[in-house]
Every structure is written in structure tokens, then in C-alpha cells.
A protein has these predicted regions:
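NAD(P)-dependent Rossmann-like dehydrogenase/reductase catalytic/cofactor-binding core
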Residues: 31, 44, 51-55, 59, ...
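Internal alpha-helical scaffold of NAD(P)-dependent oxidoreductase catalytic cores
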Residues: 1-88
Length: 184
């Protein structure tokens, strides 16, 4: 079985369409948070790359959980700046898809991050995967949106730097760990 979210800014239309697809083993939920669904869908790719990098460097479950949790916080912060609904980021579109994409070895974004964490160049990692890695493109776009809204997105920023080969994966970890502690 699987589940997904269908987003449309017209509630009645989304409700109507969802009935065409919704089945016992294919659960379709609907949302009118069109912006939140789009942002969550793009940002989870970037966070999944970060988690892959961490795992590629040999870090364990604690680092993975921290990146997923703090990454979700970045998703919520940017979403809030664009008037997205917080509940979108706590549902299938946000947390659900983030958990799947960041932890499943079938995920292209996770595998890309794993390769980067193992020291493979961006180009070689893409060639190794042989498929489109959306997070590769999403990272810079997300950083631009954050900058436009004056929102600090350290995980997204560092992932874009690793992809552009402006910083090594090891230096990226040090950058994140050297940041001052903040109130959660």
C-alpha cells in the first residue's frame, strides 16, 4: 500500500479528483496548501542529500535523526514565509516523504548524497546514479528563496555548496557543527 497527497487550491476540485484515484492500497489525501506541498516536495530532496552525505561519511543514526529533524524545521520556516500551512510539513507531503526519501536506498537523492559523502564528485555521482536527481537542482533554488525571504537555511545552504564543490563534505560537517547553539 502507499499514500500520497493531491494538492489543488480549489478544495471541491481536489475532493472530486481524489475520488478517481483513492483505493484500498492507494490512499489519496487532498490539500489546498498548494505552496506548502510544492515546497515540501522540493526541500525534502535537499535534506535527503544531506542525510546521504552524513551516512556516506560514516555517521550513524543520531546524525541522521538530527539532520531529518533540523531539515524539517528548515522546511517549516521557509514554508511559513510563503504562507504555507505548518500541518502540511507534518503530514505525508512533508515528514512522510522526507523520511522515505532520506532513508530509503532506492532514493536517488539519498544515493547522490551517499556518493558525495564518500568523496565522489557531483558529476561522477550523477553518472553513477544514471537518473535525474531533483535535489541537485532544488538546493540552489531553495537557497535563493531563503535569501529572498531573509531566512537562514544552513542545511540547504551547505548541501548547495557541496554539490557545487565549493566545500568538501567533511568541511561541511564542521561548518554545521561549529554553528552556535540556538533555542529549539
Amino acid at each position: 500500500p502507499t499514500a500520497l497527497t493531491l494538492a489543488h487550491n480549489n478544495d471541491s476540485y481536489a475532493q472530486e479528483i481524489h475520488h478517481y484515484f483513492h483505493r484500498k492500497s492507494f490512499r489519496v489525501y487532498y490539500s489546498n496548501d498548494f505552496i506548502g506541498v510544492q515546497l515540501a516536495g522540493a526541500m525534502k530532496n535537499v535534506i535527503a542529500i544531506a542525510v546521504g552525505v552524513s551516512d556516506g561519511l560514516g555517521f550513524g543514526a543520531n546524525a541522521r535523526a538530527a539532520l531529518i529533524t533540523r531539515g524539517l524545521k528548515e522546511m517549516q520556516k521557509l514554508g511559513s514565509a510563503f504562507s504555507a500551512k505548518e500541518k502540511t510539513f507534518m503530514g505525508l507531503t512533508g515528514l512522510g516523504d522526507l523520511l522515505l526519501t532520506a532513508t530509503d536506498n532506492q532514493s536517488r537523492n539519498r544515493r547522490f548524497g551517499l556518493a558525495l559523502g564518500e568523496g565522489i564528485s557531483s558529476v561522477d555521482a550523477i553518472n553513477k546514479i544514471g537518473q535525474v536527481v531533483e535535489g541537485r537542482f532544488n538546493a540552489e533554488q531553495i537557497c535563493s528563496l531563503g535569501k529572498k525571504k531573509q531566512i537562514e537555511l544552513p542545511i540547504c545552504h551547505i548541501v548547495s555548496q557541496i554539490i557545487a564543490e565549493k566545500i568538501t563534505a567533511t568541511d561541511a560537517v564542521n561548518f554545521l557543527l561549529d554553528r552556535p547553539a540556538t533555542y529549539e
